[in-house]
A protein has these predicted regions:
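A short, basic N-terminal segment
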Residues: 1-60, 67, 207-208, 212, ...
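Short glycine-rich substrate-engagement loop in P-loop NTPases that contacts/grips substrate
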Residues: 58-63, 104-142
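Pre-Walker A adenine-sensing motif
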Residues: 63-76
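Walker A/P-loop nucleotide-binding motif
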Residues: 77-96
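P-loop NTPase Walker A phosphate-binding motif
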Residues: 94-108
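Loop/turn-to-beta-strand initiation segments
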Residues: 108-109, 142-145, 174-180
Length: 224
């Protein structure tokens, strides 16, 4: 049987050393669902945002969000978040997810969840084993970057208000960065929750206002 190795001679002996093909490096994509990114947002990145463009009247807000992403590492370390306010369809969630993707790429354990899902999950888990509830709530309270999508869309009751207040206050005190998207105005947020919730967020967040129309212009992401 003919050897496929490399023939060598040493001390009067002939032998073959194995010949292995060069290693093939396969890049494994992270399972984004573990960070709360699912469905139509799985391919959402800053490159995708560039293709989609931005409404002309929201260029300043988009540029501020891009600037936040450029300095993401320092913002996460200092607990500085973002509040993105405006009508449905202005790209707030897409921006938030693109920033979260950047954080994941930098090694941070971020998480995205809608407010409805957050509170539904807490309610369901509260009726089961305590360790499951505590594990989930611990992640919400302690992950370096939490994205709360559609803030204010959840049902209104005292338990919800107190739980939201508790989570946000805890994250502010721990110096954890939070990104919030909401269709509500400042006045409506203060009406839905204790005004202290918004005040706490305002102290530790950049606030961006979106106006939004369907027409979109090219988006410059060269700084990213």
């Amino acid at each position: 049987m003919k050897s496929t190795g490399i023939k060598k001679q040493e001390n009067g002996y002939e032998f073959y050393t194995p010949h292995y093909p060069p290693p093939v490096v396969v890049e494994c994509q992270k399972d984004l669902s573990q960070y709360g990114i699912k469905g139509r947002y799985l391919d959402m990145t800053f490159s995708k945002l560039k293709q989609l463009g931005a409404p002309p009247e929201d260029k300043d807000a988009y540029n501020c969000a891009l600037k936040y992403a450029v300095h993401l590492n320092e913002h996460i370390k200092s607990g500085k978040g973002l509040i993105m306010m405006g009508p449905v369809g202005t790209g707030k969630t897409s921006l938030a997810i693109s920033i979260l993707r950047r954080a994941i790429e930098q090694g941070y354990n971020g998480y995205l969840i809608s407010m409805m899902s957050l509170l539904d999950t807490l309610l369901v888990l509260s009726k089961g084993p305590a360790e499951h509830y505590l594990k989930f709530e611990n992640r919400i309270r302690n992950c370096p970057l939490l994205v709360l999508d559609d803030f204010g869309a959840e049902y209104d009751n005292k338990w919800v208000s107190s739980k939201v207040d508790s989570i946000i206050s805890d994250r502010v005190e721990r110096g954890k960065a939070t990104i919030i998207t909401t269709n509500l105005s400042v006045q409506k947020i203060k009406k839905c929750y204790d005004s202290r919730i918004y005040d706490r967020l305002k102290e530790t967040s950049f606030i961006l206002s979106f106006k939004g129309k369907s027409k979109r212009d090219p988006l410059d992401i060269s700084q990213i």
